[in-house]
């Protein structure tokens, strides 16, 4: 259904009255009102008004966890970094890799899952005011289908195994079923709430099918009949963009770096041209350390950051530019490596030269935007131009 946020008391009543509980979690209780979506296929839609895209800046950003935002000194240092360099944007976790909210959501369905149990950001409105006052473009990162909190609580939204139980990856994580439109609503409702808080852009991460674990025993159910994984992911993103564009926000999607050159969906539902029709911005994670030896003819990719990023982004831009059947196509904005991949057998220590090489490679490939990734939120200021 189109909207499914139900007051907690009503939801609990439905659950207990219908005994809709199984051993692995609550079944999401539906009412019988408005069970139809506006469209059968969300790939069949007009592109939203791109005035949003014309007004926004050429994004140059960094990533922040909820924990970093909650630590006043760390947060202020990063805000100062943005203010004193070419940076103009921040990506902030809203729903993290475990499915937990970083600030307290007012959505009853989210509260019922327990996703608010460990919020880091106590006053998101104050954070948003700081960003607005400093003219910093705010991007909400929402980890999408990887969600052990909602997947465990609402069993009927989760990916199942062939025995009918909740499927789990090799880390014990449950995932929301990308074919299930009710899981779409859980996610887009969170995105709409973030947009209402003042985020300029919603960035969907882990917007894919699971890969780790015994995927051979996955059963996606009847909703998967006759539909490819790539279609399911593209439809979800189109549906999200349709709802979010009405709120005046941009929609972006993170994709694996290899998506830029793979001609299929890599069995995860990420196909470049399909996603380019469904979002405003595509963010390939082109970290050199993540490429196998010999990729693009480079013996050790981690040692050649310029070559890997430039080649990846050049291929992606060429493919998107060649899409003659679409008048409006997604902008490319890569995630770049601002960390040292010390887990590799042989690795290069990344400093100002290596980070700047990736930025230059992005520009030389014809893209004008980029984001820096460091999981600990410690960024290489020496790689950035001063303002």
Describe these PLM feature segments:
Residues 279-290, 305-310, 315, 319-387:
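Substrate-binding cleft of secreted/luminal carbohydrate-active enzymes
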Residues 106, 148-156, 197-228:
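Active-site-proximal loop/short-helix segments
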Residues 76-100, 196-201, 281, 362-369:
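Catalytic domains of carbohydrate-active enzymes, especially glycoside hydrolases
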Residues 139-147, 203, 229-268, 326-339:
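Aromatic-lined carbohydrate-recognition surfaces of secreted/lumenal glycan-active proteins
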Residues 85-121, 211-218, 384:
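Aromatic-lined carbohydrate-binding/catalytic grooves of carbohydrate-active enzymes
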Residues 71-74, 80-85, 130, 172-207, ...:
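An active-site-proximal structural segment forming one wall of the substrate-binding cleft
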Residues 88-94, 120-166, 201-204:
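Glycine-rich, aromatic-flanked loop segments that form ligand/cofactor-binding clefts
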Residues 50-69, 145-196, 356:
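Active-site-adjacent "subsite" loops/lids of carbohydrate-active enzymes
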């Amino acid at each position: 259904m189109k909207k499914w946020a139900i007051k907690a008391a009503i939801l609990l009543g439905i659950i207990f009255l219908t005994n809709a509980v199984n051993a692995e979690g609550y079944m999401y209780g539906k009412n019988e009102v408005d069970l139809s979506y506006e469209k059968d296929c969300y790939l069949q839609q007009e592109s939203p008004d791109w005035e949003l895209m014309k007004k926004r800046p050429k994004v140059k950003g960094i990533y922040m966890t909820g924990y970093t935002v909650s630590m006043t000194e760390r947060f202020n240092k990063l805000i100062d970094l943005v203010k004193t360099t070419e940076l103009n944007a921040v990506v902030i976790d809203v729903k993290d890799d475990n499915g937990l909210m970083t600030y307290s959501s007012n959505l009853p369905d989210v509260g019922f899952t327990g996703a608010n149990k460990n919020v880091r950001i106590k006053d998101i409105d104050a954070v948003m005011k700081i960003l607005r006052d400093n003219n910093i473009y705010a991007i909400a990162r929402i980890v999408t289908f990887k969600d052990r909190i909602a997947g465990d609580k609402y069993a009927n939204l989760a990916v199942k195994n062939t025995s009918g139980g909740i499927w789990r990856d090799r880390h014990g994580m449950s995932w929301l079923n990308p074919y299930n439109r009710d899981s779409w609503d859980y996610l887009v409702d969170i995105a709409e709430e973030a947009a209402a808080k003042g985020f300029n852009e919603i960035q969907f991460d882990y917007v894919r099918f699971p890969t780790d674990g015994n995927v051979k025993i996955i059963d996606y159910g009847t909703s998967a009949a006759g539909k490819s994984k790539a279609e399911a992911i593209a439809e979800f993103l189109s549906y999200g963009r349709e709802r979010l564009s009405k709120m005046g926000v941009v929609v972006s999607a993170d994709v694996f770096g290899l998506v830029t050159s793979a001609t299929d969906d890599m069995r995860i539902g990420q196909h470049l041209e399909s996603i380019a029709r469904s979002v405003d911005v595509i963010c390939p994670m082109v970290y050199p350390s993540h490429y196998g030896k010999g990729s693009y003819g480079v013996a050790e990719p981690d040692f050649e950051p310029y070559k890997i990023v430039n080649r990846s982004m050049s291929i992606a831009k060429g493919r998107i530019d060649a899409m003659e059947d679409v008048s409006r196509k997604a902008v490319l904005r890569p995630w770049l490596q601002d960390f040292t991949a010390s887990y590799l057998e042989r690795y290069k220590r990344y400093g100002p030269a290596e980070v700047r090489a990736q930025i230059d490679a992005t520009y030389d490939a014809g893209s004008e935007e980029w984001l820096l990734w460091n999981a600990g939120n410690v960024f290489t200021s020496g790689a950035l131009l001063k303002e």
